[in-house]
C-alpha cells in the first residue's frame, strides 16, 4: 500500500488528523493566533486567484495542509460565489496537472481513498484508421454501474464520456489515464465545493475576523458614481450588471433591470461570459473617477489582501 502525499493533496487529510501533530487539544485558531504565517499564505493565494495568476502546488508550500484549510475557510467566510468558483477552478487545474504526472499505482490509491473503486488492468485494443492498424493502451477500468455513477455529470458536458465511446467487457468499462484523471478531478472538485459551502462548519475566529475586515471594504468609487446616476447608457449599465454578478449580488441586478433573465445572460455560458472591465479599460471609457491603485474595481471591493 502506497503512502499518500498529503503535502501535494492536502484536502485528502482531515484537519483534525493534521492538528494531532501538535500539542494535544490545539486548534487551528490557536495556531493562527500564535503567528501570521498561515493567514499570510491564505491571503496571498486568494490574491493570486482574484488576479488570475498561477498558483503554486501545495507541496511547494511549508505546512501545506494547514495552509490549505486556512485558505479554504477564508474563502468560505468571504462567502462570495464568484470567488468560490475561481478558487475551485484554480485548485482543480493544479490537481489535474499533478495527477497526470502520478504513477498508475498512485492514481488507483488516490481513487480508492476517495471511494472510487478503480482497477488497474492494462489491455491493448487494436483498431483500424485510414487503412492502418493502430493500438490503444487502456490501463484502467471501472465497474459498469460505477462508470455511470461517476460520469453522470461529465456525460452532460462531454460526449467523450458516453458509454458508446468506450470498451465494455465483462461488466467493466475501460478508460485511459487522461479519462481517469478527469473523473478524479471532477470528484475532487465536488468534494472541495461541499467543503467550501458547508454552512455548519465552525470557522476559526481569526479567519472570521479577517473575512469581516476584507468584506468591509467600500464599493469602488467608479461603481458608486454609476449607482448615483439616474440614467445609464448601455456601457454603464453593462458595467454595473457585471459588477453585481461578480460580487454575487444578483438581487441588485434584478432590481436594476426588472428582468430576471438578465442574470443568466450575463453569467454567460461555455462560449460567452461577461466580466468586469479592468481599471485601465474603465479609464479609456471615461468611467474612472479616482486613483485607487488597483488593477480592477473588484480588487478594491475585496481588498488587496495586504
UniProtKB/Swiss-Prot annotation:
Entry-linked Pfam families: DNA_primase_lrg
Superkingdom, natural source: Archaea
Family: Belongs to the eukaryotic-type primase large subunit family.
Lineage: Archaea, Thermoproteota, Thermoprotei, Sulfolobales, Sulfolobaceae
Annotated cofactor note: Binds 1 [4Fe-4S] cluster.
SS bond list: none
Keyword Hydrolase assigned: no
Physiological role: Regulatory subunit of DNA primase, an RNA polymerase that catalyzes the synthesis of short RNA molecules used as primers for DNA polymerase during DNA replication. Stabilizes and modulates the activity of the small subunit, increasing the rate of DNA synthesis, and conferring RNA synthesis capability. The DNA polymerase activity may enable DNA primase to also catalyze primer extension after primer synthesis. May also play a role in DNA repair.
Protein name listed in UniProt: DNA primase large subunit PriL
Gene Ontology biological process terms from the UniProt entry: DNA replication, synthesis of primer
InterPro entries, A to Z: DNA_primase_lsu_euk/arc, DNA_primase_lsu_PriL
One GO cellular component term: primosome complex
Quaternary context: Heterodimer of a small subunit (PriS) and a large subunit (PriL).
Listed cofactors: [4Fe-4S] cluster
Source organism of this protein record: Sulfurisphaera tokodaii (strain DSM 16993 / JCM 10545 / NBRC 100140 / 7)
Binding site for [4Fe-4S] cluster: 222, 279, 288, 292
Keywords carried by this UniProt record: 4Fe-4S, DNA replication, Iron, Iron-sulfur, Metal-binding, Primosome
Record-level Gene Ontology MF annotations: 4 iron, 4 sulfur cluster binding; DNA-directed RNA polymerase activity; metal ion binding
SUPFAM superfamilies in the record: PriB N-terminal domain-like
Amino acid at each position: 500500500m502506497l503512502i499518500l502525499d498529503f503535502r501535494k493533496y492536502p484536502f485528502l487529510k482531515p484537519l483534525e488528523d493534521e492538528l494531532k501533530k501538535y500539542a494535544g487539544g490545539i486548534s487551528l485558531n490557536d495556531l493562527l493566533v500564535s503567528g501570521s504565517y498561515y493567514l499570510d499564505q491564505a491571503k496571498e493565494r486568494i490574491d493570486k486567484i482574484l488576479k488570475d495568476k498561477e498558483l503554486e502546488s501545495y507541496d511547494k508550500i511549508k505546512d501545506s495542509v494547514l495552509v490549505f484549510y486556512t485558505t479554504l475557510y477564508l474563502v468560505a467566510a468571504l462567502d462570495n460565489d464568484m470567488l468560490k468558483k475561481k478558487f475551485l477552478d484554480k485548485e482543480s487545474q493544479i490537481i489535474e496537472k499533478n495527477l497526470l504526472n502520478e504513477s498508475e499505482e498512485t492514481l488507483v490509491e488516490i481513487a480508492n481513498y476517495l471511494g472510487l473503486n478503480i482497477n488497474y488492468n492494462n489491455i491493448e485494443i487494436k483498431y483500424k484508421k485510414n487503412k492502418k492498424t493502430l493500438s490503444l493502451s487502456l490501463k484502467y477500468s471501472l465497474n459498469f454501474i460505477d462508470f455511470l455513477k461517476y460520469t453522470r455529470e461529465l456525460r452532460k458536458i462531454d460526449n467523450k464520456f458516453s458509454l458508446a465511446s468506450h470498451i465494455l467487457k465483462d461488466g467493466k468499462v475501460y478508460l485511459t489515464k487522461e479519462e481517469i484523471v478527469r473523473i478524479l478531478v471532477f470528484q475532487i472538485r465536488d468534494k472541495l465545493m461541499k467543503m467550501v459551502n458547508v454552512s455548519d462548519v465552525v470557522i476559526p475566529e481569526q479567519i472570521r475576523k479577517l473575512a469581516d475586515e476584507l468584506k468591509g471594504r467600500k464599493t469602488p468609487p467608479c461603481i458608486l458614481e454609476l449607482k448615483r446616476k439616474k440614467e445609464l447608457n448601455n456601457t454603464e449599465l453593462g458595467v454595473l450588471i457585471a459588477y453585481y454578478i461578480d460580487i454575487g449580488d444578483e438581487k441588485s441586478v434584478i432590481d436594476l433591470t426588472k428582468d430576471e433573465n438578465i442574470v443568466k445572460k450575463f453569467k454567460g455560458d461555455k462560449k460567452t461570459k461577461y466580466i468586469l472591465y479592468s481599471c485601465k479599460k474603465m479609464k479609456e471609457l471615461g468611467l474612472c473617477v479616482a486613483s485607487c491603485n488597483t488593477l480592477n474595481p473588484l480588487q478594491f471591493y475585496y481588498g488587496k489582501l495586504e
